[in-house]
């Protein structure tokens, strides 16, 4: 910082600084000195400049190469992800189709099972009805037989008196004698 301040202070004492312009005289401009300085800069600075440019070029090329590699890797990963996505879509479609067919199959099985249960219940109901009909018929037969027997006994008791009783006995005795005489 002190150097810069000193330079500014001392520059005020320079007489050239006050008169700045373009000098067109070649001999006064010292073109040869400038050419020598530029030539030396080119000759000695060429290696350094070439090294700097070469290093910069290598850095840029390696950066481009890395970017291309990352791009290729990203492209590969994207393609792999797309393939996985397609496989997942196919798998999802298969699962959906299998699910729908499974639902249809289970629906048919449930309908068949319900039909079988309904048929079994209908058969059981019909068997129960037939059994109850048979039981009712049997009860009616027994009741009719009992009533017929009671009426027959009542009728016999009303008609059967001692005279009829004697005649029936005599008749049967006569039949037994007739059978006995034919068998001799």
From Swiss-Prot:
The chain crosses the membrane at residues 4-24. It holds the Pfam family ATP-synt_B. The keyword Thylakoid applies. GO terms for molecular function: proton-transporting ATP synthase activity, rotational mechanism. Coiled coil: none annotated. In plastids the F-type ATPase is also known as CF(1)CF(0). HAMAP family: ATP_synth_b_bprime (MF_01398). This is ATP synthase subunit b, chloroplastic. The gene is atpF.
């Amino acid at each position: 910082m002190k150097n810069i301040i000193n330079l500014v202070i001392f520059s005020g004492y320079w007489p050239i600084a006050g008169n700045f312009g373009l000098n067109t005289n070649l001999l006064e401009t010292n073109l040869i000195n400038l050419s020598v300085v530029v030539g030396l800069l080119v000759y000695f600075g060429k290696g350094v400049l070439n090294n700097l440019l070469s290093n910069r070029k290598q850095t840029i090329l390696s950066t481009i190469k890395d970017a291309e590699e990352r791009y290729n890797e990203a492209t590969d990963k994207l393609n792999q992800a797309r393939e996985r996505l397609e496989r997942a879509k196919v798998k999802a479609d298969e699962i959906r189709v299998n699910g729908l067919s499974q639902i249809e199959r289970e629906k048919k099985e449930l309908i068949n099972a319900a039909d079988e249960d309904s048929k079994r219940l209908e058969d059981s109901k019909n068997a129960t009805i037939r059994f109850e009909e048979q039981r009712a018929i049997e009860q009616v037969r027994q009741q009719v037989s009992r009533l017929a027997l009671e009426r027959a006994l009542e009728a016999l008791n009303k008609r059967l008196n001692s005279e009829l009783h004697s005649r029936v006995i005599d008749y049967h005795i006569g039949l037994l004698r007739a059978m006995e005489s034919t068998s001799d």
